[in-house]
């Protein structure tokens, strides 16, 4: 290179410049030489970095001296805000907002200061050099080092209104450090989650786009995409030149002024041409795009444009789908999910502020449309409803009348000055809303609790409560009009339940005076028992015996067996009862206390029970047994039953056989009685063997005796020639020897009508409660019940049951009484213990509470002593609630059924103001802090005036002499401002404790920019999910008319009037804010409210608009609108994070999401309704239908998310390898699908060569190779023939005709292909004639499955 060519450029080469340099070298000189240059640059950099020794020391961190002043100013402003809040001028929310915005502004101002300071004092400062050259770090990190860290968010994402005022150079305080670590932890968690999410996103993207391969040179489409620079508000995110680079022009570009041709159709756009087009001032250019490419199932070379890796036209067979997927997925890890990289530091978009340049007066023109509104800081301002200007009239200096200054205001701006206001230079006039997207800042409804700072009485001032009841019947009280809620100070006592006040409003009470008392009364009366304090039981229980019963003749003995005590009660008539309930336990009404021990009713075996004369209560529980009502005889027919459940082969006797006692009936089972065997078996399993004792009488004539089956024979009756001596039971049996009658013995048990009861004495109160023990006989079995048992059973039990009569107390709240079992010593003989049952009422006395913060202390006195008999309802103990400090009782509500709180107004709660002049206030006025109460005298604290006295008159002197001395007494209070719509949680006049919630303020806050950003937003877009709070889209274009609610400024609906007069209504839901002004013209598909748009809705709106060109044009238009929307939205997210991705990658993915339609009506085609088919395919079939005159298919375009699109590909192998494998494969099998192995994934799974790169078959058609060489030679061979470019890639090899070895006969067979007869101009229907031996090589080209239609 000669010296004449040397150009010296004197500029700083920072990160951006380096990038441009390398990109230029790469485009112009190829890979190898660029690599060498990059290497040299690296050496250069390292050499000088080493020489300079740039490093950061603590001294390099220079803190701007203005920091202190800035912080002081901010703190001053916040103090002022705090005062306004204390005075009730702004709500809690407005205070919070103001604090946050103040700190935010300060932080930003400080950041600018830092930069200025560095530039002024030391531009070679190493921190400054590093950050601003782009080597390491960025401005926000520098800000944290030398400015202030600023506001942080807590784990819930709420901003903490305590900023970190220090930086890392000064060091953080402990509090600041802890607040900092919130954000840091969040960042770590986020990174961990993000990598996983991002990886999965990449996987889905690859899956949806893996079969997009460049398969043609030119699809010949005339459609294209109109591209302009990408802007957000006034800021250009991506300039036009950048977006054009590497594209192919779709329509000739003509210079807007000279009308000369800049670039022709189908020419690629290198960097210089892109710059030239941008300079010429062309606003938008039509380019070819993968979105509009008409190649079937692929993208053609012209529509894709450059391969960005080589800055050359893309090759045939390039797998652009995979490249696109990776280009979008890879930066995913850099996208934030929630927090910013700065460790949770809050960054907010500050609106652009307009400050006055001069001193002067504000003049607002008449035609400027404004309405007053309250800003989020609680200040009054004007909202500009339509674009306009305001004038500043400068203050006259001398005779010169200077020019008026104009300030332009856009719709949505906020004016902080009013007509006629005087302003100083530098004063804030307005905040201009930034145009574009930021005006649709997403707001969300949020609520904030306001808790009371002091205890006292609630008083509403100007607040108008309004009650609403929802469908569930819950009532909410909201403030219809905003205003103040006052809490007037006083000590509030919470009274325990059941307490009765002993004072009334206005009473004076001394410290420790009684406010209220609770009485503890006995319900039933009786004898008082005060138990001694045992370790387990405290004396706070009082027992009152209401009734008792004693077994006076019976003695109780205790038998211990195996560690368990058995209590036996022996009565005078030699009966022994076993106690079923142990002493010290409670017994319920009707429970068994004891059971008689006797053996008279025991049987020896199981058997059959019949009643003779015995009657039992019908409704008995089988578990407890049946109570005997009337005595009689029980007849018991014994039989012996063995339950076996073994195999039938073990049976040693047969059914009906007579056996002697001791015979082995089943292996290891012997019978105990002689009798007839009855065997029950099922499925060769022996269930049971029953031996029925008795005598067997053989009969000859079965008919004559069949009537005697199951009857009794009385003693003395003659039967079958024998005279019976006792009662027998006759049964007919079939024995192996023949029919016979079995005469079975019967055992009789006599049951008396009433069992004898041990004697008792009972004591009962006059209340009519009585208690007694009753003896009951119970039978465990029913009449004719078979009892299976080998051992004996007990047929009758005699039990003692407790009975408590509750007279006149059928109401359920009288608890079911229980009796206590006790052992008492006999009065005459202390050795003997008697059994006593008592009914106790036990009352618990409250503990004495020493003064609790909210309750006052309590004191309890006992009114009874041990052994005293009391009447029902008498008071046993009373608890008094004492007042802590003296004062006046207030706030006792009349008429409310139970008083839960009362208030004592103490001296501490009052404040006296002395004034020598006549007061301006009257009793009952509510004053906020700083109000003038008399000329020159101001209220030191907020409160309510309770008294105004003339001191002289009060002292009893002549009032005429000194009227100059007034005393104003106020009751300290605290105002809280309530915004309209807030939910009230208290009522006027309520008493509240400190910390009780007063109201829920409902407010709208701008969502922090990063709530749904980054990955989640990209996922939402690519999965085509409906956004949570979507905006309302205009369905048809027209003029906007805003409908306001009656109350005034809140818009409740939008009407759009079309040109032909049709009106469409759009009601506004809660939290939806208008972004179109009244009277403006909107287009179809334009958002009317803020929030993200729903892509499905965009598609539907444009499809339903219709067009003259038929359904295909209509669907194409709708799809194109949605495609551009998606591409731009995805770009927005990446741009907001400073990541550059070429549009074409996103377009490839979006193309895959939007190439299907849902068939509504198949017409005469073979397609079914609901089927998802490619748009181009349907259109092809429809064209065929049009020729034959059949009915066309009707369809609706659909937008599929990437997961759904992957599962709906033509290739079932690819879909199955992605998700839901079994479902995909079974459905494919049922439908008999075939897979044409078009994509990469299918081929990898089957194990074939993939149809991309070297595996792509360029030589399908003779002559293709020649076109191909011509195609690329023009664009590639400009500077490649340079010996330095050592990298030899396939492209250059092909151009130099270094033929890559093709496979011979041994490979896939020779590939002979001819164009088919059906060859069509637009190449949509192309068919291959394939050799028979070419079966493995499936039709790879754009072969279509519908040729035979």
UniProtKB/Swiss-Prot annotation:
Catalytic activities: RNA(n) + a ribonucleoside 5'-triphosphate = RNA(n+1) + diphosphate
Segments of this protein annotated with the region Disordered: 1298-1349
GO molecular function, a single term: DNA binding
Enzyme superclass (EC): transferase
Biased composition (Acidic residues): 1319-1349
GO biological process: DNA-templated transcription
Keyword presence, Amino-acid biosynthesis: no
InterPro entries found in the cross-reference section: DNA-dir_RpoC2_beta_pp (IPR012756), DNA-dir_RpoC_beta_prime (IPR045867), RNA_pol_Rpb1_3 (IPR007066), RNA_pol_Rpb1_3_sf (IPR042102), RNA_pol_Rpb1_4 (IPR007083), RNA_pol_Rpb1_5 (IPR007081), Rpb1_funnel_sf (IPR038120)
Necessary cofactors: Zn(2+)
Binding positions for Zn(2+) per the UniProt entry: 219, 293, 300, 303
SUPFAM superfamilies: beta and beta-prime subunits of DNA dependent RNA-polymerase
EC code: 2.7.7.6
Co-factor binding comment: Binds 1 Zn(2+) ion per subunit.
Pfam families the UniProt entry points to: RNA_pol_Rpb1_3 (PF04983), RNA_pol_Rpb1_4 (PF05000), RNA_pol_Rpb1_5 (PF04998)
Keyword terms of this UniProt record: DNA-directed RNA polymerase, Metal-binding, Nucleotidyltransferase, Transcription, Transferase, Zinc
Cellular-component GO terms for this entry: DNA-directed RNA polymerase complex
NCBIfam families from the UniProt entry: PRK02597.1, rpoC2_cyan
Subunit structure: In cyanobacteria the RNAP catalytic core is composed of 2 alpha, 1 beta, 1 beta', 1 gamma and 1 omega subunit. When a sigma factor is associated with the core the holoenzyme is formed, which can initiate transcription.
Protein function: DNA-dependent RNA polymerase catalyzes the transcription of DNA into RNA using the four ribonucleoside triphosphates as substrates.
Family named by the database record: Belongs to the RNA polymerase beta' chain family. RpoC2 subfamily.
Protein name as catalogued: DNA-directed RNA polymerase subunit beta'
Biological source species: Nostoc punctiforme (strain ATCC 29133 / PCC 73102)
């Amino acid at each position: 290179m000669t010296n004449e060519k040397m150009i010296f450029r004197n500029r700083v080469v920072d990160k951006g410049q380096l990038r441009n340099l390398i990109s230029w070298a790469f485009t112009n000189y190829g890979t190898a030489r660029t690599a060498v240059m990059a290497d040299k640059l690296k050496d250069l950099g390292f050499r000088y970095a080493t020489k300079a020794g740039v490093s950061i020391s603590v001294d390099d961190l220079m803190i701007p001296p203005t920091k202190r002043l800035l912080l002081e100013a901010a703190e001053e402003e916040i103090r002022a805000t705090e005062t306004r809040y204390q005075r009730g001028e702004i709500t809690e929310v407005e205070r919070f907002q103001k604090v946050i915005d103040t700190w935010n502004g300060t932080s930003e101002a400080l950041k600018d200061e830092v930069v200025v300071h560095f530039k002024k004092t030391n531009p070679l400062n190493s921190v400054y050099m590093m950050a601003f050259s782009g080597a390491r770090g960025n401005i926000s990190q520098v800000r944290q080092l030398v400015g202030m860290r600023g506001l942080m968010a807590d784990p819930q994402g709420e901003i903490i209104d305590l900023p970190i005022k220090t930086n890392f150079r000064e060091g953080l305080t402990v509090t600041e450090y802890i607040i900092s670590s919130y954000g840091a932890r969040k960042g770590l968690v986020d990174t961990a989650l993000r990598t996983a999410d991002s990886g999965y996103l990449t996987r889905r993207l690859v899956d949806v786009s893996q079969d997009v391969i460049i398969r043609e040179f030119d699809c010949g489409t005339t459609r294209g995409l109109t591209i302009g620079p990408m802007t957000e508000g006034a800021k250009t995110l991506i300039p036009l030149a950048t977006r054009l680079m590497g594209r192919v022009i779709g329509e000739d570009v003509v210079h807007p002024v000279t009308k000369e041709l800049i670039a022709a159709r189908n020419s690629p756009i290198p960097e210089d041409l892109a710059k030239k087009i941008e300079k010429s001032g062309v606003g938008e250019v039509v380019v070819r795009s993968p979105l509009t490419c008409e190649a079937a199932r692929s993208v053609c070379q012209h529509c894709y444009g450059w391969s960005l890796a080589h800055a050359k036209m893309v090759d045939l067979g390039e797998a652009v789908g995979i490249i696109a997927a990776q280009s979008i997925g890879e930066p995913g890890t850099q996208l934030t999910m929630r927090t910013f990289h700065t460790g949770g530091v809050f960054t907010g978009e500050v609106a652009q502020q307009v400050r006055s340049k001069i001193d002067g007066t504000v003049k607002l023109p008449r035609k400027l449309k404004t309405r007053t509104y309250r800003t989020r800081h609680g200040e009054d301002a004007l909202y500009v409803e339509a674009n306009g200007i305001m004038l500043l009239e400068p203050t006259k200096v001398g005779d010169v009348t200077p020019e008026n200054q104009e300030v332009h205001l856009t719709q949505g701006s906020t004016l902080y000055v009013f007509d006629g206001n005087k302003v100083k230079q530098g004063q804030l006039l307005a905040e201009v809303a930034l145009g574009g997207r930021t005006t649709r800042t997403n707001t969300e409804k949020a609520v904030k609790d306001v808790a009371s700072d002091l205890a006292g009485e609630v008083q509403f001032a100007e607040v108008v409560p309004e009650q609403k009841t929802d469908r569930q019947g819950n009532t909410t009280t909201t403030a219809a009009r905003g205003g103040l809620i006052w809490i007037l100070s006083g000590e509030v006592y919470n009274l325990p339940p059941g307490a009765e006040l002993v004072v009334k409003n206005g009473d004076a009470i001394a410290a420790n005076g009684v406010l209220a008392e609770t009485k503890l009364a006995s319900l039933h009366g009786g004898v008082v028992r005060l138990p001694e304090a045992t370790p387990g039981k405290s004396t706070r229980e009082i027992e009152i015996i209401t009734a008792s019963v004693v077994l006076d003749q019976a003695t109780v003995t205790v038998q211990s067996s195996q560690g368990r005590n058995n209590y036996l009660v022996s009565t005078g008539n030699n009966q022994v009862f076993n106690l079923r309930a142990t002493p010290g336990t409670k017994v319920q009404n009707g429970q068994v206390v004891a059971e008689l021990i006797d053996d008279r009713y025991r049987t020896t075996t199981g058997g059959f029970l019949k009643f003779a004369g015995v009657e039992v209560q019908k409704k008995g529980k089988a578990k407890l047994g049946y109570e005997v009502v009337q005595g009689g005889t029980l007849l018991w027919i014994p039989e012996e039953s063995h339950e076996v459940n073994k195999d039938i082969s073990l049976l040693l006797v047969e059914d009906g056989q007579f056996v002697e006692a001791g015979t082995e009936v089943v292996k290891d089972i012997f019978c105990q009685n002689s009798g007839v065997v009855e065997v029950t078996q099922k499925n060769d399993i022996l269930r049971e063997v029953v031996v029925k004792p008795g005598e067997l009488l053989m009969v000859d004539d079965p008919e004559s005796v069949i009537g005697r089956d199951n009857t009794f024979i009385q003693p003395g009756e003659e039967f079958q020639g024998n005279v019976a001596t006792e009662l027998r039971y006759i049964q007919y049996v079939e024995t192996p020897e023949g029919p016979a009658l079995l005469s079975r013995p019967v055992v009789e048990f006599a049951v008396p009508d009433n069992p004898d009861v041990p004697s008792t004495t009972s004591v009962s109160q006059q209340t009519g409660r009585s208690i007694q023990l009753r003896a009951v006989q119970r039978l465990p079995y029913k009449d004719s019940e078979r009892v299976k048992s080998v051992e004996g059973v007990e047929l009758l039990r005699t039990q003692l049951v407790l009975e408590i009569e509750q007279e006149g107390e059928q109401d359920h709240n009288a608890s079911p009484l229980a009796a206590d079992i006790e052992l008492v010593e006999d009065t005459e003989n202390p050795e003997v213990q008697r059994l006593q049952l008592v009914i106790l009422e036990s009352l618990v006395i409250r503990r004495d509470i020493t003064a609790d913060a909210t309750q006052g202390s309590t004191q309890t006195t006992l009114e009874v002593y041990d052994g005293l008999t009391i009447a029902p309802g008498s008071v046993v103990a009373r608890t008094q609630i004492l007042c802590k400090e003296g004062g006046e009782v207030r706030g006792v509500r009349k008429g409310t059924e139970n008083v839960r709180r009362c208030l004592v107004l103490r001296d501490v709660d009052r404040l006296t103001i002395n004034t020598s002049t006549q007061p301006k206030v009257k009793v009952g006025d509510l004053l906020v802090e700083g109000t003038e109460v008399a000329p020159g005298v101001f209220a030191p604290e907020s409160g309510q005036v309770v008294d105004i006295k003339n001191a002289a008159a009060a002292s009893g002197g002549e009032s005429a002499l000194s009227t100059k001395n007034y005393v104003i007494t106020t009751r300290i209070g605290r105002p809280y401002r309530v915004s309209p719509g807030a939910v009230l949680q208290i009522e006027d006049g309520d008493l509240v404790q400190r910390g009780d919630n007063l109201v829920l303020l409902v407010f709208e806050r701008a969502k922090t920019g990063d709530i749904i950003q980054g990955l989640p937003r990209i996922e939402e877009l690519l999965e085509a999910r409906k956004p949570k709070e979507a905006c309302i889209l205009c369905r048809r274009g027209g003029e906007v008319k805003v409908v306001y609610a009656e109350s005034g400024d809140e818009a409740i609906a939008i009407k759009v009037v079309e040109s032909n007069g049709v009106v469409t209504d759009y009601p506004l839901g809660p939290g939806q804010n208008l972004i179109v002004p009244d009277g403006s013209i909107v287009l179809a598909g334009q958002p009317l409210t803020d929030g993200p748009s729903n892509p499905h809705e965009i598609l539907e709106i444009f499809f339903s608009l219709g067009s003259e060109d038929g359904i295909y044009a209509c669907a194409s238009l709708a799809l194109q609108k949605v495609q551009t929307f998606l591409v731009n939205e995805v770009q927005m997210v990446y741009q907001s994070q400073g990541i550059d991705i070429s549009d074409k990658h996103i377009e490839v993915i979006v193309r895959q999401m939007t190439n299907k339609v849902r068939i509504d009506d198949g017409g005469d085609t073979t397609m079914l309704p609901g089927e998802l088919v490619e748009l181009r395919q349907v259109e092809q079939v429809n064209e065929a239908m049009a020729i034959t005159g059949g009915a066309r298919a009707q369809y609706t375009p659909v937008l599929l998310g990437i997961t759904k699109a992957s599962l709906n590909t033509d290739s079932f192998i690819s879909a199955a390898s992605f998700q839901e494998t079994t479902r995909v494969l079974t459905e494919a099998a049922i439908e008999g699908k075939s897979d044409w192995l078009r994509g990469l994934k299918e081929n990898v799974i089957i194990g074939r060569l993939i149809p991309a790169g070297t595996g792509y078959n360029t030589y399908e058609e003779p002559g293709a190779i020649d076109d191909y060489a011509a195609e690329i030679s023009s664009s590639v061979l400009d500077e490649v023939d340079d010996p330095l470019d050592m990298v030899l890639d396939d492209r250059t090899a092909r151009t130099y005709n270094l033929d890559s070895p093709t496979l011979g006969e041994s490979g896939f067979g020779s590939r002979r292909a001819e164009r088919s007869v059906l060859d069509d101009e637009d190449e949509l229907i192309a068919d291959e004639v394939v050799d028979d031996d070419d079966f493995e090589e499936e039709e790879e080209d754009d072969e279509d499955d519908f040729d035979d239609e």
